[in-house]
Design a protein with these regions (language model features):
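A composition/secondary-structure signal for short, hydrophobic, low-basic-content segments
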Residues: 52-54, 134, 234
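Active-site beta->alpha N-cap acidic-glycine motif
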Residues: 57-148, 152-166
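Short phosphate-engaging motifs
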Residues: 38, 92, 242-246
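Catalytic domains of cell-wall/extracellular-matrix polysaccharide-remodeling enzymes
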Residues: 142-255, 259-266, 274-279
Protein backbone atom coordinates (compact mmCIF):
# COMPACT_ATOMS: atom_id res chain seq x y z
CA UNK A 1 0.00 0.00 0.00
CA UNK A 2 2.81 2.34 0.91
CA UNK A 3 4.63 1.39 -2.27
CA UNK A 4 1.52 2.19 -4.33
CA UNK A 5 1.23 5.63 -2.73
CA UNK A 6 4.89 6.37 -3.48
CA UNK A 7 4.33 5.46 -7.13
CA UNK A 8 1.38 7.82 -7.32
CA UNK A 9 3.45 10.64 -5.81
CA UNK A 10 6.22 9.94 -8.30
CA UNK A 11 3.79 10.00 -11.23
CA UNK A 12 2.27 13.26 -10.03
CA UNK A 13 5.72 14.84 -9.67
CA UNK A 14 6.76 13.67 -13.10
CA UNK A 15 3.62 15.07 -14.67
CA UNK A 16 4.14 18.38 -12.90
CA UNK A 17 7.71 18.61 -14.13
CA UNK A 18 6.64 17.74 -17.67
CA UNK A 19 3.85 20.31 -17.59
CA UNK A 20 6.23 22.98 -16.32
CA UNK A 21 8.69 22.08 -19.07
CA UNK A 22 6.00 22.39 -21.72
CA UNK A 23 4.94 25.79 -20.36
CA UNK A 24 8.53 27.06 -20.27
CA UNK A 25 9.25 25.76 -23.78
CA UNK A 26 6.08 27.32 -25.15
CA UNK A 27 6.85 30.65 -23.49
CA UNK A 28 10.42 30.66 -24.78
CA UNK A 29 9.31 29.80 -28.31
CA UNK A 30 6.63 32.50 -28.26
CA UNK A 31 9.10 35.20 -27.15
CA UNK A 32 11.59 33.96 -29.76
CA UNK A 33 9.03 34.35 -32.55
CA UNK A 34 7.97 37.81 -31.36
CA UNK A 35 11.58 38.98 -31.18
CA UNK A 36 12.34 37.63 -34.64
CA UNK A 37 9.20 39.19 -36.10
CA UNK A 38 10.04 42.62 -34.65
CA UNK A 39 13.59 42.44 -35.96
CA UNK A 40 12.35 42.06 -39.57
CA UNK A 41 11.16 45.37 -41.14
CA UNK A 42 7.90 45.33 -43.02
CA UNK A 43 8.49 44.40 -46.63
CA UNK A 44 6.66 47.41 -47.99
CA UNK A 45 8.55 49.82 -45.72
CA UNK A 46 11.93 48.30 -46.56
CA UNK A 47 11.27 48.33 -50.28
CA UNK A 48 9.83 51.83 -50.13
CA UNK A 49 12.85 53.14 -48.23
CA UNK A 50 15.25 51.40 -50.59
CA UNK A 51 13.43 52.69 -53.66
CA UNK A 52 13.41 56.22 -52.23
CA UNK A 53 17.17 56.13 -51.64
CA UNK A 54 17.80 54.77 -55.14
CA UNK A 55 15.56 57.45 -56.67
CA UNK A 56 17.32 60.20 -54.70
CA UNK A 57 20.72 58.90 -55.79
CA UNK A 58 19.61 58.78 -59.44
CA UNK A 59 18.22 62.33 -59.25
CA UNK A 60 21.46 63.54 -57.65
CA UNK A 61 23.45 62.01 -60.49
CA UNK A 62 21.23 63.81 -63.03
CA UNK A 63 21.52 67.16 -61.23
CA UNK A 64 25.29 67.02 -60.76
CA UNK A 65 26.99 65.65 -63.86
CA UNK A 66 30.60 64.62 -63.28
CA UNK A 67 33.06 67.47 -63.75
CA UNK A 68 35.05 67.28 -66.95
CA UNK A 69 38.82 67.20 -66.92
CA UNK A 70 40.13 70.59 -67.99
CA UNK A 71 43.17 71.94 -69.77
CA UNK A 72 45.08 74.93 -68.34
CA UNK A 73 42.94 77.26 -70.49
CA UNK A 74 39.77 75.82 -68.94
CA UNK A 75 38.66 73.93 -72.03
CA UNK A 76 37.76 70.25 -71.71
CA UNK A 77 40.38 67.57 -72.29
CA UNK A 78 39.91 65.54 -75.46
CA UNK A 79 38.11 66.24 -78.73
CA UNK A 80 34.88 68.09 -78.03
CA UNK A 81 32.67 70.05 -80.42
CA UNK A 82 29.88 72.39 -79.35
CA UNK A 83 27.17 72.87 -81.98
CA UNK A 84 25.47 76.23 -81.42
CA UNK A 85 22.42 77.75 -83.11
CA UNK A 86 21.52 81.45 -83.12
CA UNK A 87 18.39 83.53 -83.81
CA UNK A 88 15.73 81.08 -82.66
CA UNK A 89 13.21 80.06 -81.71
CA UNK A 90 11.60 79.73 -85.11
CA UNK A 91 9.26 77.54 -87.10
CA UNK A 92 12.27 75.27 -87.67
CA UNK A 93 13.23 74.74 -84.01
CA UNK A 94 11.23 71.52 -83.72
CA UNK A 95 12.87 70.08 -86.83
CA UNK A 96 16.34 70.90 -85.51
CA UNK A 97 15.41 69.15 -82.26
CA UNK A 98 14.20 66.12 -84.21
CA UNK A 99 17.56 65.75 -85.98
CA UNK A 100 19.54 66.25 -82.77
CA UNK A 101 17.40 63.71 -80.92
CA UNK A 102 17.76 61.17 -83.71
CA UNK A 103 21.54 61.62 -83.65
CA UNK A 104 21.74 61.60 -79.81
CA UNK A 105 23.41 65.02 -79.78
CA UNK A 106 22.89 67.86 -77.30
CA UNK A 107 23.60 71.43 -78.36
CA UNK A 108 23.49 75.06 -77.28
CA UNK A 109 20.89 77.54 -78.55
CA UNK A 110 21.17 81.33 -78.33
CA UNK A 111 17.64 82.66 -78.63
CA UNK A 112 16.31 86.10 -79.41
CA UNK A 113 13.82 87.77 -77.10
CA UNK A 114 11.45 88.99 -79.80
CA UNK A 115 11.11 85.39 -81.01
CA UNK A 116 10.76 84.00 -77.49
CA UNK A 117 7.71 86.23 -77.04
CA UNK A 118 5.94 84.33 -79.82
CA UNK A 119 3.77 81.84 -77.93
CA UNK A 120 3.66 79.54 -80.97
CA UNK A 121 7.38 78.83 -80.48
CA UNK A 122 7.43 78.36 -76.71
CA UNK A 123 6.57 74.65 -76.57
CA UNK A 124 9.71 73.83 -78.55
CA UNK A 125 11.74 76.05 -76.23
CA UNK A 126 10.53 73.93 -73.31
CA UNK A 127 11.17 70.77 -75.32
CA UNK A 128 14.76 71.83 -75.99
CA UNK A 129 15.48 72.06 -72.27
CA UNK A 130 13.75 68.75 -71.53
CA UNK A 131 15.89 67.04 -74.16
CA UNK A 132 19.14 68.25 -72.63
CA UNK A 133 19.98 71.36 -74.65
CA UNK A 134 21.17 74.65 -73.14
CA UNK A 135 19.41 77.89 -74.01
CA UNK A 136 21.28 81.17 -73.71
CA UNK A 137 20.36 84.72 -74.73
CA UNK A 138 20.97 86.53 -78.02
CA UNK A 139 19.42 89.93 -77.09
CA UNK A 140 15.87 91.17 -77.61
CA UNK A 141 16.28 93.06 -80.88
CA UNK A 142 19.55 91.91 -82.54
CA UNK A 143 20.01 95.60 -83.34
CA UNK A 144 23.70 96.58 -83.19
CA UNK A 145 22.96 100.30 -82.92
CA UNK A 146 20.75 99.83 -79.85
CA UNK A 147 22.99 97.22 -78.26
CA UNK A 148 26.41 98.79 -78.69
CA UNK A 149 25.93 102.50 -79.41
CA UNK A 150 22.96 103.20 -77.17
CA UNK A 151 24.15 101.05 -74.27
CA UNK A 152 21.29 98.54 -74.30
CA UNK A 153 23.41 95.37 -74.38
CA UNK A 154 23.08 94.43 -70.70
CA UNK A 155 19.40 95.50 -70.32
CA UNK A 156 18.42 93.53 -73.43
CA UNK A 157 20.33 90.45 -72.35
CA UNK A 158 18.78 90.58 -68.88
CA UNK A 159 15.32 90.83 -70.41
CA UNK A 160 15.99 87.90 -72.73
CA UNK A 161 17.40 85.75 -69.91
CA UNK A 162 14.29 86.54 -67.85
CA UNK A 163 12.07 85.41 -70.74
CA UNK A 164 13.96 82.12 -70.96
CA UNK A 165 13.49 81.65 -67.22
CA UNK A 166 9.76 82.37 -67.42
CA UNK A 167 9.29 79.85 -70.23
CA UNK A 168 11.58 77.04 -69.09
CA UNK A 169 12.22 77.54 -65.38
CA UNK A 170 15.98 77.56 -66.01
CA UNK A 171 18.24 80.45 -65.00
CA UNK A 172 20.89 80.76 -67.71
CA UNK A 173 23.79 83.19 -67.54
CA UNK A 174 25.38 82.69 -70.97
CA UNK A 175 24.82 85.08 -73.87
CA UNK A 176 26.11 85.46 -77.38
CA UNK A 177 26.52 89.03 -78.66
CA UNK A 178 24.88 89.59 -82.04
CA UNK A 179 27.68 89.93 -84.63
CA UNK A 180 30.16 88.76 -81.99
CA UNK A 181 31.96 90.55 -79.18
CA UNK A 182 34.32 92.29 -81.63
CA UNK A 183 34.00 95.19 -82.02
CA UNK A 184 30.75 95.47 -80.05
CA UNK A 185 32.29 94.76 -76.64
CA UNK A 186 35.59 96.51 -77.26
CA UNK A 187 34.98 99.15 -74.60
CA UNK A 188 35.98 98.23 -71.05
CA UNK A 189 32.98 100.05 -69.61
CA UNK A 190 30.46 97.76 -71.31
CA UNK A 191 32.46 94.70 -70.29
CA UNK A 192 32.48 95.91 -66.68
CA UNK A 193 28.69 96.18 -66.85
CA UNK A 194 28.47 92.60 -68.13
CA UNK A 195 30.65 91.34 -65.28
CA UNK A 196 28.59 93.25 -62.70
CA UNK A 197 25.43 91.66 -64.13
CA UNK A 198 26.90 88.17 -63.68
CA UNK A 199 26.64 87.43 -67.40
CA UNK A 200 29.01 85.16 -69.33
CA UNK A 201 29.82 85.57 -73.03
CA UNK A 202 30.57 83.05 -75.76
CA UNK A 203 31.62 83.77 -79.32
CA UNK A 204 32.76 80.88 -81.55
CA UNK A 205 35.80 79.20 -83.10
CA UNK A 206 34.14 78.21 -86.40
CA UNK A 207 31.80 80.40 -88.45
CA UNK A 208 29.85 78.20 -90.86
CA UNK A 209 28.56 81.29 -92.73
CA UNK A 210 25.33 79.36 -93.11
CA UNK A 211 23.15 82.46 -92.94
CA UNK A 212 24.32 83.67 -96.37
CA UNK A 213 24.35 80.28 -98.09
CA UNK A 214 20.66 79.91 -98.90
CA UNK A 215 20.05 76.76 -100.91
CA UNK A 216 23.67 75.64 -100.55
CA UNK A 217 23.93 73.18 -97.63
CA UNK A 218 26.97 71.49 -99.18
CA UNK A 219 29.03 74.67 -98.88
CA UNK A 220 28.08 74.92 -95.21
CA UNK A 221 29.37 71.39 -94.70
CA UNK A 222 32.61 72.20 -96.53
CA UNK A 223 33.11 75.38 -94.48
CA UNK A 224 32.80 73.42 -91.23
CA UNK A 225 35.11 70.64 -92.37
CA UNK A 226 37.76 73.02 -93.69
CA UNK A 227 37.92 75.16 -90.56
CA UNK A 228 37.91 72.33 -88.00
CA UNK A 229 41.51 72.37 -86.80
CA UNK A 230 41.42 72.20 -82.98
CA UNK A 231 40.47 69.59 -80.41
CA UNK A 232 37.82 71.90 -78.95
CA UNK A 233 35.58 73.70 -81.44
CA UNK A 234 32.47 75.86 -81.05
CA UNK A 235 30.52 76.01 -84.31
CA UNK A 236 28.33 79.02 -85.12
CA UNK A 237 25.15 78.17 -87.03
CA UNK A 238 21.64 79.58 -87.36
CA UNK A 239 18.11 78.20 -87.56
CA UNK A 240 18.00 78.27 -91.37
CA UNK A 241 16.58 75.71 -93.85
CA UNK A 242 20.00 75.20 -95.47
CA UNK A 243 21.54 74.57 -92.04
CA UNK A 244 18.89 72.00 -91.22
CA UNK A 245 19.77 70.19 -94.44
CA UNK A 246 23.49 70.30 -93.65
CA UNK A 247 23.20 69.27 -89.99
CA UNK A 248 23.15 65.44 -90.34
CA UNK A 249 26.32 65.50 -92.45
CA UNK A 250 28.06 67.87 -90.04
CA UNK A 251 27.24 65.56 -87.13
CA UNK A 252 28.47 62.57 -89.12
CA UNK A 253 31.74 64.37 -89.89
CA UNK A 254 32.48 65.06 -86.22
CA UNK A 255 31.56 61.53 -85.16
CA UNK A 256 33.94 60.08 -87.75
CA UNK A 257 36.69 62.41 -86.49
CA UNK A 258 36.24 61.10 -82.95
CA UNK A 259 34.68 64.21 -81.39
CA UNK A 260 32.32 64.16 -78.45
CA UNK A 261 29.40 66.58 -78.57
CA UNK A 262 29.42 69.08 -75.75
CA UNK A 263 26.57 71.18 -74.41
CA UNK A 264 27.35 74.33 -72.48
CA UNK A 265 27.59 73.78 -68.72
CA UNK A 266 28.08 76.78 -66.42
CA UNK A 267 30.24 74.70 -64.07
CA UNK A 268 32.64 74.00 -66.95
CA UNK A 269 32.66 77.51 -68.45
CA UNK A 270 35.77 78.54 -70.34
CA UNK A 271 36.72 81.89 -71.81
CA UNK A 272 35.62 82.25 -75.43
CA UNK A 273 35.26 85.88 -76.42
CA UNK A 274 37.12 87.81 -79.08
CA UNK A 275 38.10 90.45 -76.51
CA UNK A 276 39.96 87.73 -74.55
CA UNK A 277 38.50 89.06 -71.31
CA UNK A 278 38.96 86.28 -68.73
CA UNK A 279 36.14 87.68 -66.61
CA UNK A 280 33.58 86.89 -69.29
Amino acid sequence: MKESQNKKKTNVGTKAILSLGVVLATTFFTFFLIGKWNSIPAKGVANGSSNQVNTQQQEKKKETPPAKQKRPDGKPVGKVVYLTFDDGPSELTGKFLDVLKEQHVASTFFMQGSNLQNTAFQENVKRAVKEGHYIGAHSMTHNSDKLYKKGQFVPEMKETLALIHNITGTTPKLVRPPYGSAPGLKGEEIRNQIVEAGIKVWDWTIDSNDWKLKGNPQQIIENVKRTTTEDVEVVLMHEKPQTLQALPEIIKFYKEKGYEFGVYNEADHFQLNFQKDQRL
